[in-house]
Amino acid sequence: MSSEAETQQPPAAPPAAPALSAADTKPGTTGSGAGSGGPGGLTSAAPAGGDKKVIATKVLGTVKWFNVRNGYGFINRNDTKEDVFVHQTAIKKNNPRKYLRSVGDGETVEFDVVEGEKGAEAANVTGPGGVPVQGSKYAADRNHYRRYPRRRGPPRNYQQNYQNSESGEKNEGSESAPEGQAQQRRPYRRRRFPPYYMRRPYGRRPQYSNPPVQGEVMEGADNQGAGEQGRPVRQNMYRGYRPRFRRGPPRQRQPREDGNEEDKENQGDETQGQQPPQRRYRRNFNYRRRRPENPKPQDGKETKAADPPAENSSAPEAEQGGAE
């Protein structure tokens, strides 16, 4: 066993020799420091405190590059144009808004040059005049500086995108804004809900946006009673069956007005282009406001007011049916 121990000891000596040679190559090293042995040399490098020899103080330099993830880089001294190693622990005054210690590429810094394991190292790194360094643009900011702007930003963007893409009118966009706020947290449900929400405005808006179309429906339904007037409006709100109701009333008027002349037809067309749109809009407005209270008496008033234009408007349609 003693012979084996003796054979193991000589290999242990050569690793110490390279460490000594590496230490001898450093400028400013002494033989007494190297003679402390391999383990002593490693332990002496760990403290990284006042044991390191200071070469220069308050030296200005430009950051050559700095890796934020690994936490080290190199600074090029302005006086000697020498690259000096810098570690993140050597940064004395960091940017208060940065989460990690770092220096930006191309930034001018002020530092002290000390003797390190493999050459010159930077210590007490600050900005020019002792101000905090700017830091790398790749270093993350602190939470309290980035939390609120990033949380408040997305709701506004989602509202604008939701209004521009899915709402055709400005009023509809204002109504869908609170809905977009509720939907931003669940993006996978955005495709399901907007069609349901968009049915409401399209069911209500056509009464405002397209009064003449419903005016024709109302004129056709004036002679039929209040019960038939309510049905077309309700079906238009939910399902677009407007063409069927346009065709229905003129067929019922054909036998009544076969004796009208062509001159009256032209006059009726001109009067329809001038006066009825206003009347139709007013009728729809009154009907919409007063419908839940007492629909039947208003229907009687509307039939009296609507009889003359109804005859004129149905005349060309009646003769077209006779010609067929």
From Swiss-Prot:
Q: What residues bear Phosphotyrosine in this entry?
A: Y162
Give the modified residues of type N6-acetyllysine: K301, K304
Question: At what positions is N-acetylserine found?
Answer: S2
Cystine pairs: none
- Chief location of this protein? cytoplasm
Recorded GO molecular functions are:
C5-methylcytidine-containing RNA reader activity; chromatin binding; DNA binding; double-stranded DNA binding; GTPase binding; miRNA binding; mRNA binding; nucleic acid binding
Point out the annotated site residues (description: Important for C5-methylcytosine-recognition): W65
User: Which sequence positions carry the modification called Phosphoserine?
Assistant: S102, S165, S167, S174, S176, S314
| Domain called CSD: residue spans | 61-125
Relate the outcome reported for changing K301A. Answer: Abrogates unconventional secretion
Kindly give the Pfam families that the UniProt entry links to this protein.
CSD (PF00313)
The alphabetized UniProt keywords are: Acetylation, Activator, Cytoplasm, DNA-binding, Isopeptide bond, Mitogen, mRNA processing, mRNA splicing, Nucleus, Phosphoprotein, Repressor, RNA-binding, Secreted, Transcription, Transcription regulation, Ubl conjugation
A Gene Ontology annotation in the biological process aspect, one of them, is:
negative regulation of nuclear-transcribed mRNA catabolic process, deadenylation-dependent decay
The subcellular localization recorded is: Cytoplasm; Nucleus; Cytoplasmic granule; Secreted
Composition bias, Low complexity: 155-166, 194-208
**InterPro entries found in the cross-reference section:** Cold_shock_domain, CSD, CSD_CS, CSP_DNA-bd, NA-bd_OB-fold
Quote the subunit structure annotation. Homodimer in the presence of ATP. Component of the coding region determinant (CRD)-mediated complex, composed of DHX9, HNRNPU, IGF2BP1, SYNCRIP and YBX1. Identified in a IGF2BP1-dependent mRNP granule complex containing untranslated mRNAs. Component of the U11/U12 snRNPs that are part of the U12-type spliceosome. Identified in a histone pre-mRNA complex, at least composed of ERI1, LSM11, SLBP, SNRPB, SYNCRIP and YBX1. Interacts with IGF2BP1 and RBBP6. Component of cytoplasmic messenger ribonucleoprotein particles (mRNPs).
Similarity-based family: Belongs to the YBX1 family.
- State the protein's name: Y-box-binding protein 1
